[in-house]
Amino acid sequence: MSTLPSGSVSWYKIFQRGQNYMKAWPAEKSLAPMFPEHRVVRATRFGVRFMPAVAVFTLTWQIALGGQLGPAVATAIFACSLPMQGLWWLGKRSITPLPPSLLTCFHEVRQKLNEAGQSLAPVEGVPTYQMLVEVLKRAFKLLDKAFLDDL
């Protein structure tokens, strides 16, 4: 993830790209050994769903018991930051160019989709993980699940 495309992307856009990447990621267990995204997406979805409740519970518990508010606020902020960290990582990952090993897989899957009669838009620029996810999602929808065995 050290080689990002030139041009700065605002932090808000990175979070948006992270959400789009998370929504586009195919929920196929066969991808879990190859990509860390499967685990990150599941953890981020869990965090988005439950961490705000954990933060509210922590604050309420400390206020109700007359405890110190400082540690409770720190815990609540930490709990709310966990899903944001996942979205940030996914956003950065989505704009990262593919390494050479995945680049060949990307082109092979595109070729299989073309052979299956699917029209694909030409690749503009260097392929990124977002482009790979879109191709994989389409391949899982239209091709036989065994297409991963050939890669």
From Swiss-Prot:
Cellular component, GO annotation: plasma membrane
Keywords: Cell inner membrane, Cell membrane, Membrane, Transmembrane, Transmembrane helix
Membrane topology: Multi-pass membrane protein
Family under the similarity heading: Belongs to the UPF0208 family.
Subcellular location, record wording: Cell inner membrane
Transmembrane segments annotated in the record for this chain: 46-64, 70-90
Short name of any one Pfam family annotated for the protein: DUF412
Protein name as catalogued: UPF0208 membrane protein SG1605
UniProt organism field: Sodalis glossinidius (strain morsitans)
Xref: InterPro entries: UPF0208
